[in-house]
Amino acid sequence: MTIESIIPAHLCETAAWPDFISSLCEEIRALAESEQSRFAFAESCSSGLAAASIGEIAGISQYFCGSKVTYRDNTKHEWLAVTRDTLNRFTAVSEFTADEMVAGLLTSTSEADIGIAITGHLGPDAPAEIDGHVFTAIGFRDESNTDSFRVWTQEIRLNCKSRR
């Protein structure tokens, strides 16, 4: 499985923010249902929107463990164990931060088999070259070693003109 099988490429290239979150939530719901797995979110730039969106799906409590909204760097470090070195070297808007967010989420959420991290920059005061730049990581707990995870990260450029 790859992240592209969960998040279609066309969505990553052209999606507006609400469409991206809605589609991501539907894909994650379908995956959790088919795998009979539970999942959790670690959200930064989405500020809990993924949790709120997935919470609208009837019966989702069977699969959804919860979400950690970690908007600030220090909160990412304290709640998800994202290293200060990663945040200083690569910033919060990086594949490295997304990877560590997923690992920290799965480490701290024992009943989740799947972790999804969303981090990025969505303005409103973002410079044009980074506005809409988002990294989404999806991690899967290794069945043979519950302290080991497989993580895929996708860089996404969202259509910033229609976030709401």
Segments from the language model and where they lie:
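Short alpha-helical segments enriched in small residues
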Residues: T2-R164
